[in-house]
C-alpha cells in the first residue's frame, strides 16, 4: 500500500477498481525521491503526520502530460515526494492540518521563465536548505513534457543550462524579468543553433525543440564604433576614456597635440 507506479496505455479510457476503502496508511519513505499514492479519499499534504519532519516542503508533484505541483493526494493517482532521510509518514482520513500551507512561488521576487505551466526562477540567491524545495523529481518517461535547469532544479542564480523534453516541434516560453542582469548586461537565452534571445521586461518567444538551452548574463553589444567623452573633464591629473566596438577588432588610441604631434598612445591591441 502507498506505492505509486508509471502506467502507459495505448488508448484513453477508464476502469472501476473494487476493494476495501483505505482510511489510514503508513508509508515508508526512502531518502530522496519516492513514488507514492494516497487513501481512498482526497488528503492534503499538510494533514499528513510526519513525526520525523522528513518530507521536504514543496516537493509533492503529480503528473498531467508533465509534472505539476500538488498539495492534495487524489485517489488512484501517483505522486513524487522527496524526503530528507528515510522514515515513515502516516496518512489518516479526515485528519486536520498538521502544518501551515506555504507558498513557494517566487513570482514577483525573482526573474521567471514559464513553460507549459512550469515556472523556472533565476537571478536571486536562496539558502541551501530552501534550494531543496525547488528540486524536481526524476525525469518522466519519453513522450512526456519536461523542462528544468540542469541539476534537476527549477531555480538558478545566473548562468545555467535548461534541459527540455518535448514531444512537439516547438514550444512557447513566457518570461518576466524584474531583476536586471547588471550594468551594460542583459539576460540572454541561447539555443544550440547559436540563436540568441534577449530577455527584457515581459514577453513570449516560440522556439524549436532542442535538448538544451543556455541562460546567462551577457554584455550588451554596441551597434556602432564609439569613442566617448573623457571623464572627468577638465581633469588633474587623471581622466578616463571609454570606447565601444560592435565586434572584436584591433584598437589603437593615440593622443595628439594641437600641432598634430603624437603625445601618447593609450591603447594598441
Across the structure, where does each feature detected by a protein language model lie?
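Extracellular Ig-like/FN3 beta-sandwich strand-entry sites
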Residues: 2, 76, 210-212, 248
